[in-house]
Curated annotation (Swiss-Prot):
UniProt-recorded Gene Ontology molecular function terms: flavin adenine dinucleotide binding; tRNA (uracil(54)-C5)-methyltransferase activity, 5,10-methylenetetrahydrofolate-dependent
NCBIfam families: gid_trmFO, PRK05335.1
Protein's name according to its UniProt entry: Methylenetetrahydrofolate--tRNA-(uracil-5-)-methyltransferase TrmFO
Species annotation: Nostoc sp. (strain PCC 7120 / SAG 25.82 / UTEX 2576)
Function: Catalyzes the folate-dependent formation of 5-methyl-uridine at position 54 (M-5-U54) in all tRNAs.
HAMAP family associated with the record: TrmFO
Amino acid sequence: MDQQPIQVIGGGLAGTEAAWQIAQAGVPVILHEMRPKRFSPAHHTEHLAELVCSNSFGAMASDRAAGLLHEELRQLGSVVIAKADEHAVPAGGALAVDRGQFGQDLTQTLASHPLVEFRRGEVPYIPEGIVVLATGPLTSPDLAADLHRFTGMEYMSFFDAASPIIVGDSINRDIAFMASRYDKGEAAYLNCPMNKEQYLRFREELCKAEQTELKDFERETAKFFEACLPIEELAQRGEDTMRYGPVKPVGLSDSRTGERPYAVVQLRQEDKAGQLWNMVGFQTNLRWGEQKRVFQMIPGLEKAEFVRLGVMHRNTFINAPQLMLPTLQFKQRPTLLAAGQLIGTEGYTAAAAGGWLAGTNAARLALGKEPLALPPTTMLGALLEFISSASPKHFQPMPPNFGILPDLGMKIKSKPERYGRYRDRSLADLSSWKVNLT
């Protein structure tokens, strides 16, 4: 009996990688891409894996988060990273590509594979059978509506208004204090107190800071999100607007001094290990350099290390912790898998990495094998563990970063040495794990 082809919807980085891994496993695959019959607001070519923003895949060095993920994908046989290496252009310490040659080569490579069938045109609903969804942040309206129905209205977002996330070890605990408002429950927030002078100076710089312009199609979506206003917009509305919003001091006092601050920036724990902390209510459109400059004015955050800076943009993504397994299968339908920005991973390399696992596991399902999850000590394993186990209530997309990796079990002050240890452990564990792929 002929094997039923797996369907991959979306020809971006995740879908391209997924389709390749399926075909390489000896399973036929249909790759659906709506371009050129229908273009999203951000795409301009009909090539697979079109890079619509930067042409950079991030830092190359393997003791950097992106570089470590590159190296893991090289070990796993990623076609996206292989072609990125082949079409690399000089970019200092980053892996950047000639985007035209990169997209053309990937398109030709997949088109020449005997087990890959291209279908150009929009897919308006989720098909039956084994399916990989990789439709990205600009998923077409009809398919987004069907996915919305499948996941439930409360488990899907259409706009990403995210606050910065900070490495816990970089927060000055001599200034920041643990407490919950009105001392309700356990002390769950790190609180950075400000006096009046500090607050007014912070607000002044926040109002002057340069912003990133939303694209037209993003502006239309953003205007509905009054509850997610950028922190700089609140600052501009009046001297005390923030003090009645995200930085309100009521119900908080520093037990060390007994005093109530004039304003308080709260940080909420983002991961189980308490290594990542989210700036509550600090979604922002500020340029990244400006975010670092202004937010490091906050007492306790003078040396803050940001693993993710704030963003506000159009981004269709699901509540992965509620819906997904670390194998990238949907809990309620294990034959449906997803990858890329749709599941809340952020960045080109993470999209390709998720595509690798979704494609690998889709093929395993078709071949009657058990799906696999990667070791959480690897960057890819840690990222997928995070997106499938973070708090569903506060879930926001996450890029690769060392803060999501399990603790090394020892204190290493030197950042290069610490990251090098993470890298060595990750690559060793991945090498051992690869025997499961047979």
